[in-house]
Amino acid sequence: ASAAKYESNDNYKFLNILDAEGYLIVPGFINAHTHIGDSIGKDMATDRGLEAVHPMRGIKKKILEKSNSQHLSTLMRASAISMMKNGITTFVDFREGGTEGVAILRNAIFDLPIKCLILGRVEYYFDIDRNGQHEDKNVQPIKKSKLPVKVLEIATNLLNVSHGFGISGANENTDSSLRQYNKLINKLSKSDGPKNRTKNIQLGIHAAESKSTVEFSLRRTGKTEVYRIVKHLKPNFVVHMTQATDEDISLIAKNEIGIVVCPRANGVLGCGIPRITHMLKSGCKVAIGTDNIMINSPDMFREMDYIWKTSRSSGINLDAKNVLKMATINASEILHLNSGCIEIGRSADFIFLDKTSIELYPIHDPYASIVHRANQNSIKGVMISGRFVNGSDL
């Protein structure tokens, strides 16, 4: 529409009209799953597989425990800036370290325009593989099946400073502790489950990331991780689902629980390729995350490119438009955000791509061009909440 048309409408007379001729305007990307706390450990354990990021015994845990909080904050801030430069306007972080961990992240990004949902974690785990004492006092044997009162108090305090819980996984929890987390979330949001939660309080958890985690759950509990999660936790979304069974995927779809896939991180860790096409055909809402900074760059362009091309290995092509939706509106709907698409009443979180850039010109299929050709060099501007992110932010 022309500027003159808008100027003649009283509803728009006080607005600045921008001439966006020559630009492709895209909703800002929503990075639906990150761990930016481990930015300090980039590429330190790319050859160690999933054990590197294990919450109870991985090298990541040791790195975070031994690192100075100021160093962590500085590098987390750098990762947030990197995300903005790549068109990410919102990210959802699973923040380890309890209330202190949340405070470190808040301090890192307090003056940056990027939006962040911080999902905190209580550093308390159950070792369902053994009944004896664990060397870590925060890891309890299975016979202690419930979260103790002191831990519940910590969890309640955590909810008061965060946007919800980002739980490690079902294998580090008992059925009882999963129900306790669900009860805490429902109490705060005054609801009885994810469909009825009135406040934007999120409950997310990793699920079916690898064959080993799936087999472990079946061996020790007789149920899949996903079955236990749906029955006892009732989260808003699950992360990964790389090795989920057909029954798992159907269960997630039936219960309207979102899925956040992190395919490049899964590739680095050797966990496989998530069956995204099958998830979508089953009725699941699927979004994208980049996962741990220590093993993967927070780049949604690369993520979309990888998803679009690896989907063809299933023999069923995933069209580029659906891939772009996973990075934008799908994530918004899963997380109940007021962004993710260009629509009146939505937050103005946009990416301005130069249609004449050497990477894109000439554009014959805009969706395909965005998904597998665009990159940081194609971006000429990023807008968050109606304001351009200025040069000092980027």
PLM segments and residue spans:
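Alpha-helical scaffold segments that flank or form the walls of functional sites
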Residues: 42-113, 150-160
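His/Asp/Glu-enriched, well-ordered alpha-helical/loop segment
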Residues: 224-236, 274-357, 373-375
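Histidine-centered catalytic micro-motifs
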Residues: 28-39, 202-211
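C-terminal cap of metal-dependent C-N hydrolases
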Residues: 347-394
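Active-site gating loops and adjacent loop-to-helix segments of metal-dependent hydrolytic enzymes
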Residues: 40-74, 113, 127-140, 198-200, ...
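Histidine-rich, glycine-flanked metal-binding segment
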Residues: 1-26, 155-156
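Active-site core of metal-dependent hydrolases
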Residues: 131-140, 159-294
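Divalent metal-coordination and catalytic microenvironments
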Residues: 22, 33, 87, 165, ...
